[in-house]
Amino acid sequence: RLDWIFDSDASSLAERYDRWASTYDTDHDEWGWRGPHAAAECLMLHGSGSVVLDAGCGTGQVGVALRSCGFEGDLIGVDFSSGMLATAARQGVYDQLVHATILDLPLAESSVDAVISTGVFTHGHVGGEAFSELVRVGGHGSVAVITVRQDIADDLMVDAETLEAAGRWQLVERSKPQQLHPSRDEVLQSLVVW
């Protein structure tokens, strides 16, 4: 299924996620996907504030992980797949779910204290050009925890470094590459904190 997703073009990606929504969580449980829990724990260590944006929330795995880590504030989930959002709504952990892309978030400037995103900045999905939008809604002093695949990290980090040079973002931590998706031995990811 992952190859089916990664091989799709931008116009068919949302539709493929809509079709996958009913088995997405089961599939990822079978594959041992640890990204949501690792990112949630990382965000809680760095301070979540009271309003968190789950950018590319999918079926709500990150929201569930955040709540299980003790996050009690407002949780906003954004995703471009209506099927995924319907599944996320059934999780009962989000205060607000929004159908939108990360490139054009319908949120006010500086409206969230933290951003979390797992499995989104990857092949055929979202590139580093979306970082400026996350910075916009987070504002000064916000925290962002994002999983970044090592095979595309250099390309993504160019956009992050541009924001850093402009004084809009500051790299806080980048974990060593790890297997967050054990079923895909070749895929290593880091948790990056800004």
Task: Walk through the language-model features, giving the residues of each.
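N-terminal, positively charged/glycine-rich alpha-helical extensions of SAM-dependent methyltransferases
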Residues: 1-22
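Conserved SAM-binding loop and adjacent beta-strand
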Residues: 25-40
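Class I SAM-dependent methyltransferase SAM/SAH-binding core
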Residues: 53-104
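A short acidic, Gly/Pro-enriched loop at the edge of an enzyme's catalytic core
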Residues: 103-115
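A short SAM/SAH-binding and catalytic strip from SAM-dependent methyltransferases
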Residues: 114-127
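A short glycine-rich, Lys/Arg-flanked "PGG" loop and its adjoining helix->strand segment in the class I
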Residues: 129-140
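Conserved beta-strand signature within the Rossmann-like core of class I S-adenosyl-L-methionine
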Residues: 141-149
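Class I S-adenosyl-L-methionine
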Residues: 168-194
